[in-house]
Amino acid sequence: MIYNFGAGPSVLPKEVLKKVQEELLDFEKSGMSVMEISHRSKAFQKVIDEAENDLRDLMSIPQNYKILFLQGGASSQFSMVPMNLAIGKKAYYNISGAFGEKAYDEAVKLSHFLDLMAISLGSTKKDNYNHLLKIDKSKIDEKNGAYLHLTTNNTIEGTSIFPENLPEFASLPLVADMSSNILAVDYDVSKFGLIYAGAQKNLGIAGLTIVIIREDLLNEAESLSSMMDYQILVENGSMYNTPPTFAIYVAGLVFKWVKAQGGVKKLEEMNQRKAQLLYDLIDQSDFYQNPIKNKDERSICNVVFTSPSQELDELFTQKAEEKGFKSLKGHRSVGGMRASIYNAFPLEGVVELVKFMKEFEEGYK
């Protein structure tokens, strides 16, 4: 049995893969693959409409929010967000992980050419991002602020800002990179001005980025780039140019699968259960360590851990691969191991990994 712990692209629900396989050569008796049909066809319009409606239902997205299906990966949003929201304003960044740092760096780069200010509220980098940054509201000028950007789940470092810990402001919008825990943790969309997420972790396959934006944040002023203008993209129903049709189709199937599992809250409960199995073993062990300082900040999607030495870490991932536990090697910037246990990852895979971890500890402690 193979268990894919990849951080993204990552495991997909078997039911979704089978449906893709079943329809690949003949989509809805059209005689064509879904990869071949026009994005302007009635058949594809139905696909994207259903995907949007299902996502709106799953996340209880209010009607005053627009949903976009875009290309470019979540990293493209590091530029699009300040270009659309921060002109003439101050953009604040909470840097608690490598991707938050990249988002801030991109805003700083844009500030050299555009009328905007990118302001870091601080960073936990000196501590290897092993905890989240506590936000000092006294540093924020809400009146002239565009937004506060944060990452809800740090895929590399294994930390999360859960719903109960989100900062609240009277008027400053929250912008969230939700790439690695969207649909895995139940967030109240109305708490955010804008949410974006790459699809290849919990939503489907690489090549698609979802953006959820509150209508009042759409910019009517002429922008630097039509392709990166939320207003234009909304007006064109995500079809200003040819969208990533196959990735949208797969995401739509994933949304239906999430509904069939009972929705986001049910999956969050299962994700907590899976993560707790690993954290319980790590906490009770003298062999394994989890570097996250505060237990209430531990991710339930990406569980990071180390053994007593780098040599043992390498041996662990090697032996794990031989046993069918794939992609457990930690990110190159952190080392150690990382078990990415997104929505589609089965509980039995975590149970089997825990057994293997116990056996490895017995053999090498």
UniProtKB/Swiss-Prot annotation:
N6-(pyridoxal phosphate)lysine sites (modified residues)? 201
GO MF: O-phospho-L-serine:2-oxoglutarate aminotransferase activity; pyridoxal phosphate binding
**What SUPFAM superfamilies does this protein's entry cite?**
PLP-dependent transferases
Cofactor(s) required, per the database record: pyridoxal 5'-phosphate
**Record keywords: Cytoplasm included?**
yes
Localization per record: Cytoplasm
Enzyme Commission no:
2.6.1.52
> What's noted on cofactor binding?
Binds 1 pyridoxal phosphate per subunit.
The family annotation for this protein states: Belongs to the class-V pyridoxal-phosphate-dependent aminotransferase family. SerC subfamily.
Subunit (UniProt): Homodimer.
- Which PANTHER family does its entry note? PHOSPHOSERINE AMINOTRANSFERASE (PTHR43247:SF1)
Function as written in the Swiss-Prot or TrEMBL entry: Catalyzes the reversible conversion of 3-phosphohydroxypyruvate to phosphoserine and of 3-hydroxy-2-oxo-4-phosphonooxybutanoate to phosphohydroxythreonine.
Q: Which NCBIfam families match?
A: PRK05355.1, serC_1
The name on file for this protein is Phosphoserine aminotransferase
Q: Which organism is it from?
A: Lactococcus lactis subsp. lactis (strain IL1403)
